[in-house]
């Protein structure tokens, strides 16, 4: 069976909440990276067989967000599209589904990734259709309800992270130091231009004219000195804060996948080969440590040891999520999120899964290394992982 390869990819800069990308919808962000990734792959839009794209906060966007994005990108109407909602794992699941579809021989070229405008997530009136009749009504935040809260208990994801940080014995200082390190790495990556090859510039109309957004918004704005002074976010005496958590963000990332045989026969350059994938599920309250088992599974399938991996992208939904497998599996922290993670760059929930794969590829290329693993936790108790080789 022919291996599955990634022949191109791109991402937008990560915009802050109500920040640089707030004027754009998720499909508009998605369109930018779909268009750019197809162009970088050196294929025509009509050669694409399917677009599989993650988007979690789809209320108010309109029918078929992935279909909207591909049409805005100039992909012809005969190409199908599907929108994936696997919470924070949506974009990585899109890549996994693309890989499986290609393995099955049901397609030759698939664009997979994700998009999210958390800024534009609407508020919801749950009882409006039946009528409020009398008294005060309730308004719900789509971002919280469908993105950041546990469906059964209504608890915020961060409260579970706080519980697990307590269980694992991670201190406030340890998590703050991890977040500060992430910020410093991201700041260096931005100032040194390490992200330039990943990012497609996006035009945003403002009152002053058209502004080109081509740089991650949040890392250079962060004040590192304030991090140790921030108040706990999820409990009075807690240790998790806004700084050692990922920030609410907007953005999109896409990858173009095909088989190694197709790439060779059509003269397409290969960025990376997908060596193995995995998913893991456990109790919803334990989602923050699900990446540990997902990593173990993907390494077993790849036939790799922990030490063989040259670089890791472990999504920093919270600093402790990345810290847990580092401590549990003996991962060299110097190999983790080498250009910074979500504590610094942000976490547009429907897009991060493909963003970290793309960032991993370019980090490996810059470092002259070969093997990498990308993994992220998912609300509901799950995690997904991908092992790639340059």
Annotated model-derived regions:
Residues 1-61, 65-69, 73, 80, ...:
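Conserved active-site "lid/cap" helical segment
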Residues 10-12, 23-24, 29-32, 40, ...:
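N-terminal extracellular/periplasmic Venus flytrap/periplasmic-binding protein-like
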Residues 109-163:
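Flexible glycine-/small-residue-enriched beta->alpha junction loops
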Residues 159-162, 198, 205, 275-344:
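Active-site pocket-lining segment
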